[in-house]
A protein has these predicted regions:
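Bacterial Sec-dependent N-terminal signal peptides
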Residues: 2-39
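Short glycine/acidic-enriched loop and turn motifs that connect beta-strands
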Residues: 42-46, 92-96, 141-144, 190-194, ...
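Beta-propeller blade signature
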Residues: 52-55, 102, 149, 198-213, ...
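Post-signal peptide N-terminal segment of secreted/secretory-pathway proteins
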Residues: 52-149
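Surface-exposed loop and turn segments in beta-propeller and other repeat-based domains
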Residues: 67-68, 114-120, 159-169, 215-233, ...
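Repeated scaffold domains used in trafficking and secretory/extracellular systems
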Residues: 71-83, 120-128, 168-176, 227-237, ...
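Short, conserved, GDST-rich strand-edge loop motifs in beta-rich repeat architectures
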Residues: 185-202, 248-263, 310-328
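Loop/turn-rich, solvent-exposed surfaces of beta-rich toroidal or solenoidal domains
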Residues: 294-370
Length: 389
């Protein structure tokens, strides 16, 4: 198996396809397993539960269970894959051991091959690899970025961004992207909870020179009304197209603060400022084939030629009393970044927030979905737009 074939998919609420908890059936064969499956099993409150990580074969359809699953922190950010290694984060709220854990694929199974101790309440969420021996780890809870060797799992340094915090000493560094020797870091600027100050519907990006590991500058969009650049747990919420233009998905305080909009901003190739000609507001935007308007992008994955696939959280589908990840209110869409349009993907029901994972694999998009009818992973043909049954 080629290293590039190790792919992450995630299913929420219950196991992919048929299983729904630790299953008494025999272990699922792991030969030729090259898809990493993270499974989330929330309790009714959505704030607690269990999570597992395992490898599965790329045979569809198939049934699986959690007997091969490795317990991982329930509230951790999505695991990050680099080659044959998978990096697992501690719980975002500090409800687990304070460490970054590395697992390596060996003969179709995952083996624990390293750990790196982290400070308490780090809320580590994202890794960017500068080289085989140098990586950056954002710690949203501390306002810092750790520099470490992903081979030895030893920290080598740290970048303190606390001076960029608004109303506190923490700008909440989130998802990151490396382009031309510069590290672009989304700053969520959350204050006293999950949202930024109401009077500041802005988007901030820190830019770091990776040759010196020093802050170059912070850039701010103050005019679009779009806020909270990148979703902390989604490494793909900041990405590049083939032109090397950077696109940033901003979650707009998750729709919880009046005057804050979700949207997409751009930093063009060769530039280190926001592109004033590209400010696409997602909040309230129309979606072709769908009667209700958009809220914010809960997950996104760029494919090519301006095309991306995403889940849009839809406030119009929230039922009384529903909130956050437990609401069945996320709609799968195809996005055209260049003409700023969205269309509904046929063949998928609304999902809760636990199942909204997108992965690229062998010319298809693997889409996690946790609806009222079924919970599993579906394959979408990029060329035809058809979804597996």
């Amino acid at each position: 198996m080629k290293i590039r074939n190790l792919t992450l998919a995630l299913a929420g609420t219950a196991l992919v396809f048929s299983a729904c908890e630790k299953d008494p059936d025999p272990k699922v064969p792991a030969d030729n397993a090259n898809i990493a499956l993270a499974t989330i099993l929330p309790n009714p409150d959505g704030m607690t539960g269990a999570a597992y990580l395992q490898l599965i074969r790329d045979e569809f359809p198939q049934n699986t269970n959690n007997n091969n699953g490795i317990p991982i922190p329930y509230e951790g950010a999505y695991p990050v894959i680099e080659g044959n290694d998978i990096f697992v984060f501690p719980g975002y709220m500090g409800d687990s051991k304070n460490e970054l854990v590395k697992y390596t694929r060996v003969n179709g199974r995952l083996s624990k091959t390293g750990t790196m101790k982290l400070p308490p309440n780090s809320s580590a969420t994202n890794i960017v690899f500068a080289s085989a021996e140098k990586a950056y780890l954002s710690m949203a809870g501390l306002g810092r970025i750790a520099i470490f060797n992903p081979i030895t799992m030893v920290q080598k340094g740290e970048i303190d961004l606390s001076s960029l915090g608004v109303s506190d000493n923490n700008p909440d560094p989130s998802a990151m992207l490396l382009r031309d020797g510069l590290l672009y870091v989304g700053l969520s600027q959350m204050v006293g909870g999950w949202v930024p100050p109401q009077d500041r519907p802005y988007s901030d990006i820190a830019i770091i020179d990776t040759q010196t590991d020093k802050l170059l500058k912070m850039i701010t969009d103050k005019t679009s009304g779009i806020s909270m650049p990148t979703r902390p747990i989604d490494r793909y919420s900041i990405f590049m197209d083939e032109k090397k233009d950077i696109y940033i998905s901003c979650v707009g305080a998750f729709g919880m603060v009046k005057g804050h909009n979700a949207g997409i901003l751009r930093i063009k190739a060769g530039e280190t400022e926001f592109d004033p000609t590209y400010r696409w507001t997602i909040t309230g935007a129309d979606i072709s084939g769908e009667e209700k308007t958009a809220g914010f992008i809960s997950a996104i994955r760029y494919v090519n030629n301006g095309k991306a696939y995403a889940y849009i959280n839809m406030p119009g589908y929230y039922k009384p009393g529903e909130q956050g990840h437990t609401a069945i209110a996320d709609l799968a869409v195809e996005i055209n970044l260049y003409d700023r349009s969205m269309k509904k993907i046929k063949g998928l029901d609304l999902s809760n927030g636990f199942g909204v994972m997108l992965a690229l694999y062998k010319g298809t998009v693997l889409i996690g979905n946790s609806s009222t009818k079924a919970k599993g992973i579906y394959s979408l043909n990029i060329q035809t737009g058809e979804v597996s049954k």
